[in-house]
Design a protein with these regions (language model features):
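Solvent-exposed alpha-helices and their adjacent loops that cap or buttress functional pockets
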Residues: 7, 120-122
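Conserved N-terminal structural segment that caps and organizes enzyme catalytic cores in eukaryotes
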Residues: 115-117
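Active-site gating loop/helix substructures
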Residues: 122-133
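Patatin-like phospholipase
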Residues: 3, 7-16, 21-112
Length: 133
């Protein structure tokens, strides 16, 4: 119910993020420039945030937390990426992929650090995310 005012405006500004780690990170450079040129935060500039896979993290950080681009850049640090994409020796050497590509332990810890125990319904603006494992 709290998002019905989204539909009262004639035009909606939607920001959609692609999946894939590199695409999720590259878009941040464009968004930083957009913030500088518009003198408004990305959170203020859009009505709805959408993301797939790694792009869903960006959408959630903006829509749920009202994060700034600097916060997203902190999420995508090299150290965090190493922890998110951690693979066991068996996963690295196996010719068959019988399990998820990456362990979820590091991912869960990092996501908890940025989102605590928030639920998507607690977002500050509407967010749509798609993902699969």
């Amino acid at each position: 119910m709290k998002y019905f005012n989204l539909f009262s405006k004639k035009y909606k500004k939607v920001l959609a993020f692609d999946g894939g780690g590199v695409r999720a990170i590259i878009g941040l450079y464009f968004l930083r420039k957009l913030e500088e040129e518009s003198s408004k935060s990305i959170f203020e500039s859009f009505d709805l945030f959408i993301g797939t896979s790694a792009g869903a993290t960006n959408a959630l950080m903006l829509g749920m937390n009202g994060s700034k681009i600097e916060d997203l850049e902190k999420f995508w640090t090299t150290d965090n990426l190493k922890r998110i994409m951690n693979q066991s020796f068996i996963d690295k050497t196996s010719i068959f992929q019988t399990r998820p590509k990456y362990s979820n332990e590091g991912k869960k810890e990092i996501l908890h650090n940025f989102f605590d125990n928030k639920k998507i319904g607690q977002s500050l603006k509407p967010v749509v995310v798609t993902a699969y494992d």
